[in-house]
Amino acid sequence: MKKNTVALLALMLAFVMLFAVGCDTLPEDVDELVVYNWADYIYDYEDDFKEYYKNLTGRDIKVTYVTFDTNETMLTKILNGDSIVDVMCPSEYAIQKLLENGLLRELNYFGTAEEYIDTNSLNGYVHNSENIDSRFIEKIDEVFGSVQITDGDGTKTVRMADYFVPYMYGTLGVLYNKVYFEELGIYDRETLNNANWGLLFNDDGNGNLLSDGLTGRIYMKDSIRDSYAATVFYLLESGKLDGLTVQDTSSPNYGKPYTELTMGQMINTVDDQLIDLCADVLKKQKEQLYGYEVDFGKNELIQGIAYVDLAWSGDALYAVEESWDDDYIDPMLEYEEGESGGYTLGYYVPHDSGNIWFDGWVIPTTCPDEHLQAAKIFINFLNELYVSANNMMEIGYTSAVSAEKVRNDPECREILAQGYLVYGEDWEITDEDGNVLSQEDCDYASWEEFAEYFFDYVDPIDDSNWRYPFEIVPDNEYGREINQLGVMKDFGANNNKVSTMWEDVRSTGITAWALLGWTALALAVVVGVIALVLWLKRRKMMYVVVKKSSTEQHK
């Protein structure tokens, strides 16, 4: 209750700040910028940006930083015209929705520097568009291509990549506890890769129960889009869509078998038939669930309260790194005699089908002309290599900036080395007290050892690179390819149908384990009340006895 109150107050404060910005009168030599972003989704950037801005413009800048908790919160404020924002960071489908409503300024960031910004008014401006991994833009063009928008000039078709700049990206997968999977006898390559998305449904991939021990130990995301995507993939790989065709008459894939769709097409199909199938599976899944969560699932997995959770790769990486146990011995790894230590959590990316998502920076049409240059400078600043390294180290997600450029940049190496305690002859690693650490005291004995973990990691279970999903292991056993990762679009006219389905699923009964939890809580409350009544009754009797005794003494 207290947490909800604090969250509500935070949202109210953010709402007030969005209205209040621009009310203060600033000195003539100070510019202003209003940034709207997810909470905890950037490093402590402000001093670096102010210096960067001053070097380019010769002017100071005041930054107002406001956060949102969901894309829907952000969309509501922008679509209703309830906010004053200069630059913001929505997810892919929200960018599409804003663009279709004519609410985004064209950027042309991937053209020339002169097309993007007035370079003549800046001192030594370096355009950082080439720092972005080109495969990212290719994927966006492949999925979204041209978007039809309606603005003040009427209806026209535009390229989505001209209206945003990628920021962070990742995958959707399954976070799991290795220790308990090992106890249940299901921690091995064959078992997990047969189950795939079935891990979330306690299905071994053949329609059988994966393990009795998983019942009541599975978390599902309280997120319409992510849960829908995972369920669609499960339906596809489990054969439940065999022989069925797309029923949406407005879809270009109408009448086409689901099994012949690309992952991009599959993940964006929302016809009545598929929605009903998802609803049936999700309702049945509740028999296996511990519950639904958004932010706290990773803690329950580390503690062993739950064993499985639908997770975003950035959260998963953070959770995995938090799960290190010096005494744990991972049966999938090789150890020298007497050695131990490993991560008790793992992140599994199903190999047949999956979702790759991204967030990007946009400038809404509400951005005043006098703030436009500052907004564009801010976006370019975020694509500085050292900024990218700081962001990845701070928040755990993968930057759209090229991994190779970050890897080979001396400044980035030193930033990552300090953050991850990597020994190197070109820098000194210090602890919190400023003491220089020896090679033995560092977590990584060399940059090469760290780079193998950070940039080149290959999961021993699913052959995937968690941090960089564009990097595909050539000889991976299960034939994983990047085209098996689809990007979700806005559901458009079908959004209400999916939302209604999800609300129906969430409100249909409660999970058996949640019922047990509430029953236990109710019993605890009843026992507590009875104990309190008995204690008060006993206290009253003691009071009467004491009072009577005292009265007798005064007689």
Question: Model features per residue range: what roles?
Answer:
Residues 220, 227-346:
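Ligand-binding pocket segment of bilobal, Venus flytrap-like solute-binding proteins
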Residues 436-555:
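Conserved C-terminal helix/tail region of periplasmic/extracytoplasmic solute-binding proteins
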Residues 19-22:
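C-terminal motif of bacterial Sec signal peptides marking the signal peptidase cleavage site
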Residues 72-85, 96-101, 199, 204, ...:
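Short helices/loops that flank or line small-molecule/ion binding pockets
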Residues 361-481:
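Mature extracytoplasmic/periplasmic domains
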Residues 106-117, 126, 164-165, 327-355, ...:
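Short beta-strand->loop
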Residues 69-72, 96-169, 193, 198:
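Hinge/lid segment of periplasmic solute-binding proteins
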Residues 25-101, 113-122:
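Early extracytoplasmic/lumenal segment of secretory-pathway proteins
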